[in-house]
Amino acid sequence: MLTYASGLQDNGWSYAFSVSTRQGGNSYVNGVYYNAFGYFAAVEKQFNSQHRLALSILGAPTERGAQQASTQEVYDLVGNNYYNPNWGWLNGKRVNARVRSYHEPITMLNYTFDINDRSQLNVATSVRFGQNGYSALTWYGGPDPRPDYYRYLPSFYNNTYVGAQLYEAWMGNTNNIRHINWDNLYHINQSQEENPTYGAGHRAINMIEERHADQIDWNLYTQFSHIFRDNSKINGGLNLRRNRTEYYSEVKDLLGGDYWVDVDKFAERDMGGMNPILYQNNMEYYDKYGHAQAVKKGDKYSYDYYGNIINARAWAQYSRNFGNFGVNLGGE
C-alpha cells in the first residue's frame, strides 16, 4: 500500500491519495486465485471558516477465481474436501470457468457550511457505477462439460466394469478426469458443421457466459444540526436514492467457436423443437429475420432487463439532557 496526505495547506487546499493491491494464487483449493487493486483520491478546498467542499473517488477492481461445491462421493475419490470442479488445464495453465470480476467506483462530493458556532449544514452526493460479472460454463445439446457430472462418476455405473474403470481413473486422475477438458470443448466447437442461416463459421455448443448485475446508484444526503442555548440539540435531514441495475448475460468466450445461437435450450427441449417462436430469447430479432440471432463475443444474449429503485426519506431527531437523564425524540 502507498499513501500520501498533504495536510491543510496555506491556500486552503488539502489532498490525499492511496493505492494498494492484494494478490493470491493457487493454495488449498486448486484453480482459485485473487487479483485485486484499490485506489482512493480526495481533494478538499476550505474557502473560509464557514465553507468547505470535498471531492473523493475510490474503487477496487477485482477478479477472483471461484470454487464450487461437489458431492461427498467426489471428495472421497480425490481424498479431500478442497476439490474444485471449475477448472482445467489449457496450454499448460490452470483456467477457471467461474470468475467473479467487478469494478464499481464511487465518486462523492461533500459540502459543509458552518452557519455559526451552533448550526451546521452538510450536503453530500455520491454516484456508484461500473460492472459486476460472474462467468460460468454453458452448453447446448452436447455432453455436459462439468467433470463431476453424476453420469461421469463410478456410482452411476455401480457394480459394473465401467464403474470399476471410472473408480480407478478418478483415484489416479487418469487423463485429468477430475478437471474440465478445455481441449475437448474447443475440438467439439470447431467440429460443428457450418450453417448458412447464421453465416460463415462454426456454431459453438460450449461457451463461457458472464452474468451481469451492473448498477448506477445515485444518493443525495442533507443534514442540518443546531444546538440550542439550553444545550438541547436538533438534527434533521433528507435522503434521496435512485438506483438502476441492468441484469444481462454476455458472451465471454466461445471456446473456438464463431457464434452462439440465442435460443432457450430448456424451452426448446420441453417443446420438442416444434414451434420455434416458443423458445426464442429475442423475439424482435426473430420477427425481423425469421431465425434466432447468432451472437458473438461481447454480445448480450438470453436476457437483458432493468431493475429500478427510487427512495426518499426525511427524518428529524431532538435530544436534551436533564442532569443524569436524557430525552430523545425522533421520527422519519
Question: In which residue ranges do the predicted regions lie?
Answer:
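Glycine- and small hydrophobic-enriched segments that form the cores of compact globular domains
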Residues: 248-309, 313-319
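Acidic/polar loop-and-plug regions of large Gram-negative outer-membrane beta-barrel proteins
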Residues: 44-46, 52-112, 133-210, 275-295
